[in-house]
């Protein structure tokens, strides 16, 4: 990608975030084009893509035959097919898996590093973009296309926008916003995704979890009414037989070091500590607070105390902006 990522600043929680323009270099874009695109994706991901309109984007999982996620994808219609955004660390293996049956279909599946991914969030983000685009996405119309640019709208943790565009437009946006917006890299967007409870699947956790263990059903990412897709039997069993005992949680507090993706944490049990969970992502905010996204048992007590392994500091459960009730 020729567009240079912005230098990192310590991320800020959404409630205190000034207007910020971010380069999303830790995320990556991929596309499927061709006459069979919709049919092909319908057989590969958990969401019902046949029901998607041009004005929607949705979270979906791409699973293996056992229902474990290679990756989760932020999907939207693009040209005569679809595009999706996922963590850069999983794109190559995810595309390798997705292409396995493509030889029998009229599709072309490819990474897209020509386009640039930007995020805009923080104080009066909508007003800042309203001067630059003739229409902005909203709850009713979550995807808007203008020229070479696609804008995606997100409600949580506070209104924000993901921009998929060409290099020239990315440079124009940077020039226009440079004076009024802080510039940051993808760690800020990661912090917002953690706060929003959007699961972050990096390479360390690819192939480890069924979608429901990361709350995908609560985020509208699983259709239980659509036809067959890879891993469907296991995903359905988890719902209808109550086989899933895990959920994605948001923890906040202090830690002397950031836990890495794939690491476990420790849960306080009386005077002792017991290993628990799997970390998906963690970020240290500018106020010193550490936020951690972790998959753990879904019956944790709300007042449970956790820590990074052998650490002197503690973490506690924070509420997510959505309900886990089906």
From Swiss-Prot:
The lineage of its organism: Bacteria, Pseudomonadati, Pseudomonadota, Gammaproteobacteria, Enterobacterales. Keywords: Cytoplasm, Folate-binding, tRNA processing. GO terms for cellular component: cytoplasm. SUPFAM superfamilies: Aminomethyltransferase beta-barrel domain (SSF101790), Folate-binding domain (SSF103025). Gene3D superfamilies: 2.40.30.160, 3.30.70.1630, Aminomethyltransferase beta-barrel domains. GO terms for molecular function: folic acid binding. Folate binds at residues 27, 189. GO terms for biological process: iron-sulfur cluster assembly; RNA modification; tRNA processing. It comes from Shigella boydii serotype 18 (strain CDC 3083-94 / BS512). This is tRNA-modifying protein YgfZ.
């Amino acid at each position: 990608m020729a567009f240079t990522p912005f230098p990192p600043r310590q991320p800020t929680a959404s409630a205190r975030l000034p207007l910020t323009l971010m380069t999303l270099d830790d995320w990556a874009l991929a596309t499927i084009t061709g006459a069979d695109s919709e049919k092909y994706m319908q057989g590969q991901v958990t969401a019902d893509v046949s029901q998607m309109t041009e004005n929607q984007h949705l979270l979906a999982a791409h699973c293996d035959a056992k229902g474990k996620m290679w990756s989760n994808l932020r999907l939207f219609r693009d040209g005569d097919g679809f595009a999706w955004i996922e963590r850069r660390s999983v794109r190559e293996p995810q595309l390798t898996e997705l292409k396995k049956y493509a030889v029998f279909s009229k599709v072309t599946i490819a990474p897209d590093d020509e386009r640039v991914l930007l995020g805009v969030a923080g104080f009066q983000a909508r007003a800042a973009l309203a001067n630059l685009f003739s229409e902005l996405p909203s709850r009713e119309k979550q995807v808007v296309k203008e020229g070479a640019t696609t804008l995606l709208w997100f409600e949580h943790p506070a209104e924000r926008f993901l921009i998929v565009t060409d290099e020239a437009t990315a440079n124009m946006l940077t020039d226009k916003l440079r004076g009024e917006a802080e510039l940051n890299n993808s760690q800020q967007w990661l912090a917002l995704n953690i706060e929003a409870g959007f699961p972050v699947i990096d390479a360390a956790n690819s192939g480890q979890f069924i979608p429901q263990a990361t709350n995908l059903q609560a985020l509208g990412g699983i259709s239980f009414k659509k036809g067959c897709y890879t891993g469907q039997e296991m995903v359905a069993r988890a719902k209808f037989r109550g086989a899933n005992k895990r959920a994605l949680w948001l923890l906040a507090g202090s830690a002397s070091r950031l836990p890495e993706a794939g690491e476990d944490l420790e849960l306080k049990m009386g005077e002792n500590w017991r290993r628990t969970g799997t970390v998906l992502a963690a970020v240290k905010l500018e106020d010193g607070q550490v936020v951690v996204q972790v998959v753990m048992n879904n019956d944790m007590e709300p007042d449970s105390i956790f820590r990074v392994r052998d650490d002197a500091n503690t973490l506690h459960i924070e509420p997510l902006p959505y309900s886990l009730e089906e």
